[in-house]
Amino acid sequence: MIFQTPLVTGRLERRYKRFLADVTLDDGRFITASVPNTGSMLGLTAPGSRVWLSVSDAPHRKYAHTLQIVEADNTLVGVNTGLPNRIAEEAILNSLIPDLAGYASLKREQKYGRNSRIDLLLDDGPRQRAYVEVKNVHFIRTLGLAEFPDTVTARGAKHLDELVDVVAAGHRGVMLFIIQRNDCSRFSISGDLDPTYARAFERARANGVEAWAVRCHITDKSIDASELVPIE
């Protein structure tokens, strides 16, 4: 996934109201940027952190700058939760995940379950449909170990239960965790932060839901799916 325009750099002053951040750009300008991330961004909002932002000249936008990357623990971390679906799609189409390769049709945001939309739907006539739910990951506490979630997510547990229903109906249910950072070689569920999600994940795996974790390679020019990493 290549950024359409060059990113600009600066230092984070603060994140607030969840969707806003104040940043001092390297050219000295003080700006307010939009933050495309509804999560806690635990460990990624320290004042003074190096940040990269995209810039839009669209006249309807209130904030021209959008936070895309934060430097944390000496590595680049993608924080835009609107990107993982695109990264996942590229990973599937490039056969990075062999078990999901070769489907004739890939559709986005299809209705399913209890008033939900599946991120990606893979279909191929005689093969089982694959319903793929994508989650963004950028939280670590232990060197090399990415974790999800970084806060309680009732919606995430609901999605797991809906994937169980998909499998029961004869299709494939898939959880795909996209790790938007360069420094992780393993993935785990953070059960201490959200025990309900951890139980839902174990229940889903026991009932046939597949799970994969993909690490990204991040630069100031692109964020690309790099390799599968083991789930612990």
Swiss-Prot record:
An MF annotation (GO) of this entry: DNA binding
Domain of life: Bacteria
Family: Belongs to the SfsA family.
Protein name: Sugar fermentation stimulation protein homolog
Species: Brucella anthropi (strain ATCC 49188 / DSM 6882 / CCUG 24695 / JCM 21032 / LMG 3331 / NBRC 15819 / NCTC 12168 / Alc 37)
